[in-house]
Swiss-Prot record:
This is Small ribosomal subunit protein uS17. It holds the Pfam family Ribosomal_S17. The gene is rpsQ. It comes from Salinibacter ruber (strain DSM 13855 / M31). PANTHER family: 40S RIBOSOMAL PROTEIN S11 FAMILY MEMBER (PTHR10744), SMALL RIBOSOMAL SUBUNIT PROTEIN US17M (PTHR10744:SF1). Part of the 30S ribosomal subunit. Keywords: Ribonucleoprotein, Ribosomal protein, RNA-binding, rRNA-binding.
Amino acid sequence: MEQTEEHTDTHTDEQDEAVDRNDRKERIGVVESAKMDKTITVSVRRQMKHPMYGKYLERSSTFMAHDEGDEANEGDTVRIMETRPISKNKRWRLVEIIERAK
């Protein structure tokens, strides 16, 4: 007689999806442009150390992010999160406005 071992997996697909959602990249940056409809351009600055000379250099990357309610304005500090492709260039969405521009 064959004995079948019952596979007891306590991990569900819903838990996998929740873990994946929490692993998304987040960046904090400044809104450079809010002229487009439901879209903002966010500049994210970072410091890197020069590999040979050791001097710290400032680098920046620009991301287009989805702003559903057109809430953010130029100069605001915002948090953006990686998401599914929304358009040709938009792969990020606005999570929260950390600080309003003065």
